[in-house]
Structures are given as C-alpha cells and as structure tokens.
C-alpha cells in the first residue's frame, strides 16, 4: 500500500542571507539549494523519507536496500505536471532520488498542422499547392509559437533572511490531462492528499476508488466513499475548491485558509464552514502557536515545540506529509497523536536550511522508531 499526492510541482531556488537585503543592492548568499518543491511534492518527499526510515528498521531491508527507491511498490505516487525541458528533467531526477514515483499529467504540446499557411501545416501539403495562398495572421503565428514552445514548469525563487523570507513564484501554469496517466494509477491506495493547486488533478485523485453509482441522485457520488481517507492540504483558499470539498474526509489547513464567505480566518468558523461540506475532521496549523483541531465532535489544541533559528521553508508541507504517513498507519481515532508526530517531523524540517538536508537527520529516524 502507498499514498497518492496530487498537486503542484515547482523548481524551488533558495538563497539564504545573513541580513535583511537592501532592494537596491546586489547581495551574496551564504547558502543555496535547488530542488523540486510545491506543497504536494514536498509532502510526498516527506512521506518517502518516513517510509524509508520505517524500512530501515527491518534488518533484511537495511541489508538488501534498493538501487532505485522510486521503483518500489510502496513509494509514494505524485500526480502532477512536470512539463518539458531540462528543468523538468532535473526535477524528475531529484524526485526519483527522494523516492517519489511521478505520474506526469502534463498536456502534450499541440501540433501546428492545422494552422493554414505555416510551414509543415496541412495548407502547405502538395494536395493544396494549387489552392490560393493563405497568409497566416498574427494570431496564427502566436498560436504556432505557443504550440512549439516547451511546456516549462513552475519556478519559485525564495530568499530567506533573519527577518523572514521573500517568495516570487509563477505558480501552476501547465495544462494537465489526468486521463493520460489514469491507467497508471493504482486500484487501491492507503491515503490521498491534494493541495488544490490544479483542480483537474485534485478531482482525479479524490475520486480514485469511488464506487460507480447509478440513478439520478446528484449526491450519490459524494456519499459513495472509497476505502481510504482523502486529505486536503489547505494552505490558502482557492475558488475552485468548492465543488471538491464534498470528496474530502480530513482538512489540514493553515491560519491563512479563509473561505470567501468568512470576514476573517477564524478557526471555529472555518471548521464550521468545512463541516457544512461533510468534513468533520479539521486540523488548523498556526506556525509556532498550538495546532487546533475539530475532530468528530471533539475540539482541542496540541502545543508546538519552538525551534531556535528555524528555517521554515516547507515546514507546512513536511507537517502534511508526516500527518498522511501517520494517518495511513494509525487511522483516524487519535488526532492528537497524529498532530504530535506531524509537528515533531515539521520541527526537524526547520532545523536546517532547505527542503532536503533534514531528511537524513538522525532525529527523524528516532521519530520513526518511536512511532
């Protein structure tokens, strides 16, 4: 059994500074790293690291090992859009090393064969040689340029400094076609997580394993649940989430998650809003403040241990990946245990710069062993 993650993959380019930068000056970074990132992607990488740690507890696995962790049947699946070109190839290689299997649902570039008057198009065939000359319009040339342009992935540039960080990102910009990889999706998974950055990918992931229903009842498919739990990573509200919420079983949201009907992101109101869609299990992270939860009628808070000199890039993603890993193993009966484990893993993630160094921390291995 494994987990399915669906959502955004970006190239994360991270710089660290030892001072707050002056916007008018060029500065030299004190540290630098580059890796595949994005909410669902970082969560999948976290899950893979925890899974590798669990396998290492077995003597046989530790001795035998695996030459390619991404080919293992229990490696997490990432349904995403990597795009084309050298940047995409780098991200694919990075994720393979991290032990993540990728299902790339990028829509292929359209051909230009249907654009009249352009070289290589149907209009330039011998059969139409005698036809009147059709001169391409600027719109035709623009369409041809777009068709031939590589499908480049999203890129995020992050500068981390003592007072915080600055992020510039293209966000999701690739068209996706989940049907292209539908045959590669497993029949069963242990748990699903979506980050909501691409509604088509989210829809495909959330409806995986949902039994077919007949009749004219519009709510029948919402009530026909799969055997696994489906988790929403709600970093922020996205307008296309509304029709998807009925397929979600657990929502893990940040304090920035504010549905448009609410005047402000109040935790109780957010939980009530989600409850209206049938989501009775809500976890709300708030940085260094205690994590709140509303779980099948119960409500509480779980303290978060402060980490000095924290590098918080990807901390929320690590929390989500660890939460999913624990949820798959322990089920949904004890939310505080799930939150404590996920918070501890997130605490390890902020103890070093970037989104990869911490994965080999002995503290992480001890958390897996204690679990």
Q: What does each model-identified segment do?
A:
Residues 1-23:
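Positively charged, low-complexity intrinsically disordered leader regions
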Residues 21-31, 299-307:
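Glycine/charged-rich beta-loop-alpha catalytic/anionic-binding loops adjacent to active sites
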Residues 23-27, 34, 48-190, 367-371:
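Conserved N-terminal subdomain of the carbohydrate kinase-like
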Residues 31-39:
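A short, glycine/small-residue-rich beta-strand->loop->alpha-helix junction that serves as a flexible
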Residues 84, 196-200, 234-238:
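Short beta->alpha connector loops
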Residues 177-181, 201, 239-241, 269-270:
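Short acidic active-site motifs
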Residues 207-301, 308:
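Conserved phosphate/ATP/ADP-binding segment of small-molecule kinases
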Residues 266-371:
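Conserved phosphate-binding/catalytic region of the ribokinase-like
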